[in-house]
Regions:
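Short, electropositive alpha-helical surface patch
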Residues: 58-65
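Conserved catalytic core of Hanks-type protein kinase domains
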Residues: 51-52, 64
Length: 87
């Protein structure tokens, strides 16, 4: 299953986030494959697209950062999958 993981943070957490990102790379845990990650230029927002069927692994990944950022995680479908829903 594919998920969008969107985040935003308070500006005062910026330096701590950058330090942790440099240290860890922000990589997902086993069971989650990151397809891509994008950072809003000049904003405090970003998102990634990740694939995995383990909700515990997704939750652990978010939990690693939840002291610094807020997350919205939701499953998504592509056009072909949506066509199946609509038929």
């Amino acid at each position: 299953m594919v998920h969008v993981i969107a985040w935003h943070y308070n500006p005062e957490n910026r330096n701590a986030i950058l330090a942790r990102f440099k240290e860890t790379g922000g990589l997902p845990p086993a069971g989650v494959k990151m397809i891509g990650r994008w950072h809003g230029v000049g904003t405090n927002k970003g998102f990634c697209v990740a694939e995995g069927n383990d909700p515990i692994a997704l939750a652990k990944w978010a939990q690693e950062w939840s002291d610094l950022m807020k997350f919205d995680i939701y499953p998504v479908v592509n056009d072909t999958e949506m066509a199946q829903v609509l038929s």
